[in-house]
Amino acid sequence: MTLLPGDNSDYDYSALSCASDTSFHPAFFPQRQAIKGVFYRRAQRLGPQDDLHQSISLGDRRRQIIINVGGIKYSLPWTTLDEFPLTRLGQLKACTNFDDILSVCDDYDVTCNEFFFDRNPGAFGTILTFLRAGKLRLLREMCALSFQEELLYWGIAEDHLDGCCKRRYLQKIEEFAEMMEREDEEEALDSEDQESEGPSTSEGRLSRCMRRLRDMVEKPHSGLPGKVFACLSVLFVTVTAVNLSVSTLPSLREEEEQGQCSQMCHNVFIVESVCVGWFSLEFLLRFIQAPSKFAFLRSPLTLIDLVAILPYYVTLLVDGAASSRRKPSTGNSYLDKVGLVLRVLRALRILYVMRLARHSLGLQTLGLTARRCTREFGLLLLFLCVAIALFAPLLYVIENEMADSPEFTSIPACYWWAVITMTTVGYGDMVPRSTPGQVVALSSILSGILLMAFPVTSIFHTFSRSYLELKQEQERVLIRRAQYLIKTKSQLSGMSQDSDILFGSASSDTRDNN
């Protein structure tokens, strides 16, 4: 293959000029199966039978450009690139010498006017389709990040992606950005940990204490303290849930209404106080070790902790205020209001169960899926609302005109029946009596099954993908933690060996002097 020698070549670059012949329709060269081992290689490694330029005359070479990408050759007219002057292929028209050409492509064959690009041929097929037809699609079998690199290389903006592919492409990019952000935070924490292993200063001791506190509170797999702390947290959550259930027994409720407190009621209060004390201590430790206090207070799990912990202290304040302001002349109205507030606040204690999301990969996956599938949940709610608004009035009219059913007293009451029926729950409290009403009920059941199946499929795939991502991330964290511990042990062993050598030589010198 003959290549241009450089800027001093007498080669006629007029062959690179673009002739504006609108009646010219070049032959389209379809893609062929790439030979095994040619992927990401230069074209000159292909056999002679793959030379497409042999069938192109010299006049056609002035109007056509031959592109060789990863061993697969394409031919397209120069006029195709007029609409895309800012792309990498469009920049070839502005090249005036060999060095300009090599700044755009990887290699150039003068004899056949062929440009070589050492890029992914599969992705270039999509790029070429965009240049020829104006349609840019995301390949399902190709990584979104690799496709982004190809778009940047060929100089094509992401805005040209079709709507069906753009959302999936942006979602993949956002997921990767979140993963990289988490990895950067972990690397920053690891670097802080390595810095804290330095000289034994007051700042170094404080950094080591904060690192150990962070490992114990946020990383259950970091060691024995983290596992013990996580087990205690789960244990107190379980005890709180059981204690809340016991506090609703009829005997305890009667004592509460009468203003009495037996030994069992006192024990329930003590258990609740101990659990809230543990949760308060845990919240305080998490707040102390958080690098960014504002970001910590904004996190969803922190807000859940506050909503679950604060009702206990508010209840104590309200009880104290109610006992101090209690007067015989006011009657029971004030006490009834205070009792209602206390019952509502105590019901919020069930939010302690959400704290298990800190230690459960399944609950974390559920929250991530809910955040990613807001559009699917909106579609599901929209489908149900439309179907409910259709079947409820229809059944109301049928049952009141034909069967005079006592259950379907109004359209809002029929809304409840439609919700229960379309979600296939079927309590049986409202049953259509007439034959047309039963036909409507059957239609609503089938509609509910079909309408719920469409978004649920997408939600299921998102849940599976999110679970796999979180599991892989957890494995990466464990591997990084193990590597950090191995590195720390090797450094400590090296320091101990150096100290042994130093003190050993010093002691030998002392003996020699003696």
UniProtKB/Swiss-Prot annotation:
Coiled coil: none annotated. Belongs to the potassium channel family. G (TC 1.A.1.2) subfamily. Kv6.1/KCNG1 sub-subfamily. It is a multi-pass membrane protein. The chain crosses the membrane at residues 225-246, 268-289, 301-321, 339-359, 375-396, 439-467. Pfam families: BTB_2 (PF02214), Ion_trans (PF00520). The keyword Transmembrane applies. It is found in: Cell membrane. Residues 247-267, 322-338, 397-411, 432-438 are extracellular. Residues 181-205 are annotated as: Disordered. It comes from Rattus norvegicus (Rat). This is Voltage-gated potassium channel regulatory subunit KCNG1. Gene3D superfamilies: 1.10.287.70, Potassium Channel Kv1.1, Chain A, Voltage-gated potassium channels. Chain C. Its main location: membrane. GO terms for biological process: action potential; potassium ion transmembrane transport; potassium ion transport; protein homooligomerization; regulation of potassium ion transmembrane transport; regulation of potassium ion transport. Regulatory alpha-subunit of the voltage-gated potassium (Kv) channel which, when coassembled with KCNB1 or KCNB2, can modulate their expression and their gating kinetics by acting on deactivation upon repolarization and inactivation during maintained depolarization. Potassium channel subunit that does not form functional channels by itself. Residues 1-224, 290-300, 360-374, 468-514 are cytoplasmic. The transmembrane segment S4 functions as a voltage-sensor and is characterized by a series of positively charged amino acids at every third position. Channel opening and closing is effected by a conformation change that affects the position and orientation of the voltage-sensor paddle formed by S3 and S4 within the membrane. A transmembrane electric field that is positive inside would push the positively charged S4 segment outwards, thereby opening the pore, while a field that is negative inside would pull the S4 segment inwards and close the pore.
